[in-house]
Design a protein with these regions (language model features):
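Conserved AMP-binding/adenylate-forming core of the ANL superfamily
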Residues: 6-9, 13, 17, 25-70, ...
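Structural core segment of the AMP-binding/adenylate-forming
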Residues: 55, 85-165, 488
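Conserved adenylate-forming
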Residues: 55-57, 170-189, 193-235, 246, ...
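A short helix-loop-beta submotif of the ANL/AMP-binding
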Residues: 62, 68-88, 92-96, 101, ...
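Conserved AMP-binding/adenylation subdomain of ANL enzymes
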Residues: 81, 214-232, 240-280, 295
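AMP-binding/adenylate-forming catalytic core of the ANL superfamily
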Residues: 94-100, 111-113, 391, 396-397, ...
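Gly/Ser/Thr-rich phosphate-binding loop
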Residues: 167-168, 253, 275-284, 290-354, ...
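Conserved beta-loop-beta connector loops within the AMP-binding
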Residues: 367-388, 407, 425-426, 488-492, ...
């Protein structure tokens, strides 16, 4: 008899409280140098909520969080949720200009940040550069809604209120007052604004409701990927990114333990997973998983408890990881900030061959449509086009960007993802790249991802990224940036020769640029192609 899956929809605050009531002593979060139980996290989150209320933050207010992965980060996240506020996680790698823009655009009334020896940078210094007026008294002129600057890790200094002073204010607000605020939060109320970079000059804030950020992740962790026991989940990425935040929320909702670190280092990650018996891993991106399996200390026996590993990668890498971890199932998926993370994923019952080449099928409660990017007409199965998504998980819109929101939805409420997919007759989805990542070579459409996947069939190539180079005759031609496996040697001509006669001539890269592992320009989680295009433009002036 098939398992009955109950659709349980909760607010973000409720997700924590239920698990804290069910198993208060279980560890909710473990880092190499810190940990917190569900009971402790519940109490810390209430203390943050009470303190925020004490300084004047109210339901619906936006609260920015600029803290690396840590206990402080998650107590801030849930503290804002319990109060009924809207959390605005900030990228800890952003520089002053980016932070200044987001703090102003988001209309955050408070900022929870950190000044700790473990921080990658001195956040108060960068914030002073971003918002010079915080060095003075009065209104923060660069972000006029911002009234409270709080160091959730650190001591009071200037305009910044330190942890001890901030939490002391909680004594003026009762826990019952926060309980009343929590119970008033509705499932479709905003929970998060996740800023995502794209082709626009500034990041766009995706407004996500409580149902969007809890329903799918919790259902997956409890049922679809459930093993009968609370999961032990490892997340490689920063918790300001939906790709890591979503599995974290799922872990909390399933009463599991989430493993992470303030930064990714493969040896530390392996040791953490081995020590705590990881069952579900979310490395997501090729650079992360390659760092794991290529590390000198890697031994499949270290991950003997692993059941599932999520990865988005070319089939050659998926197959390699699956071969190295035969006891686990490698699963691909697709998602983005605008869809609160995953909107489709492979089923564990699918063959490994299918999971290597597809991104699975739409999740429950989510619809997809494949359309012609030019005309918007729906396309038949087997034809590549832009994938549109509609469902409970889709954002309500881009914050304070009505025009961009209108451009991103059609008249029937379908969100235009900008991703290219082909739907197979069995509803599985095959990724074809980004609409804006298509090259036009002499009138022929070339998907960069197709050439990248072929380049990775070369035994010496570890990573490949393809971009277009302007060409006076063909409009543009493909060129490739590649990273070789350590110790391998191959020249440009050999790689180009590998392509000739095996892919169409117009798809063959016209030039190969070799990259060391440390040379790739990175966004929060993946290689930044816009930076590669800028580098190419400089190189070919």
């Amino acid at each position: 008899m098939a398992q009955t899956v109950t659709t349980e929809v909760e607010t973000l605050g409720d997700v924590l409280l239920r698990s804290a009531a069910d198993d208060p002593e279980r560890e909710a979060l473990i880092l190499p140098d810190d940990r917190v139980s569900f009971a402790e996290l519940r109490n810390r989150a209430f203390a943050v909520a009470r303190s925020l209320a004490a300084v004047g933050v109210r339901r619906g207010d936006h609260v920015a969080i600029l803290i690396p992965n840590s206990v402080a980060y998650v107590e801030a996240l849930f503290g804002v949720a319990l109060l009924g506020g809207v959390a605005v996680p900030l990228n800890v790698r952003h520089r002053a200009s980016e932070l200044g823009y987001i703090l102003a655009n988001s209309e955050a009334v408070a900022l929870l940040t950190s000044q700790d020896a473990a921080d990658p940078v001195d956040f108060p210094t960068i914030l002073l550069e971003a918002l010079p007026s915080i060095g003075e008294s009065g209104v923060v002129t660069e972000a006029q809604s911002l009234r409270h600057l709080i160091l959730l890790r650190g001591n009071s200094s200037g305009r910044f209120i330190g942890r001890a002073d901030f939490l002391a204010s909680s004594e003026t607000v009762s826990e019952s007052a926060i309980e009343q605020a929590r119970r008033s939060v509705r499932l479709r109320d905003p929970a998060l604004i996740i800023y995502t970079s794209g082709t626009t000059a500034h990041p766009k804030g995706c407004l996500l409701c409580h149902e969007a950020v809890t329903r799918g992740p919790v259902e997956r962790a409890r049922y679809r990927l459930g093993t009968g026991a609370p999961p032990v989940t490892w997340g490689a990425g920063p918790l300001f990114h939906i790709g890591s935040l979503s599995p974290f929320i799922g872990s909390i909702g399933a009463g599991g333990t989430f493993l992470t670190d303030g930064y990714f280092e493969a040896g530390r990650a392996l040791a953490l997973m081995a020590e705590h018996g990881v069952t579900l891993a979310w490395p997501w991106f090729p650079a992360i998983v390659q760092g794991i399996v290529d590390h000198p200390s890697f031994d499949p026996a270290m991950l003997a408890t692993l059941r599932y590993l999520f990865l988005i990668a070319p089939p050659t890498l998926v197959d390699r990881v699956q071969d190295l971890l035969p006891h686990a199932e490698v699963i691909q998926a697709c998602g983005m900030s605008e869809t609160a993370g995953i909107f489709a994923l492979c089923d564990v019952a699918e063959s490994r061959e299918s999971r290597a080449v597809t991104h699975g099928k739409p999740a429950a409660g989510v619809e997809v449509r494949i359309t012609d990017p030019e005309t918007g007409a729906e396309l038949p199965d087997g034809t590549m086009g832009e994938i549109l998504v509609r469902g409970y998980n889709v954002m309500d819109g881009y914050w304070a960007a009505a025009e961009k929101t209108a451009e991103s939805f059609d008249a029937e409420g379908w969100f235009k993802t900008g991703d290219l997919y082909t739907r197979l007759p069995n509803d599985s989805l095959v990724f074809g790249g980004r609409c804006k990542d298509m090259l036009k070579v002499g009138g022929e459409n070339v998907a960069a991802i197709e050439v990248e996947a072929f380049l990775c069939t070369h035994p010496d190539i570890k990573t490949a990224e393809v971009v277009g180079r302007p060409d006076p005759r063909l409009d543009e031609v493909p060129v490739a940036f590649v990273e070789l496996y350590e110790g391998r040697v191959v020249d440009e001509e050999a790689i180009i020769a590998h392509c000739r006669g095996r892919i169409a001539s117009y798809k063959v890269p016209r030039a190969i640029y070799f990259m060391a592992s440390t040379e790739w320009p990175m966004s929060a989680t993946k290689i930044d192609k816009r930076a590669l295009r800028a580098r190419l433009a400089e190189m070919t002036k």
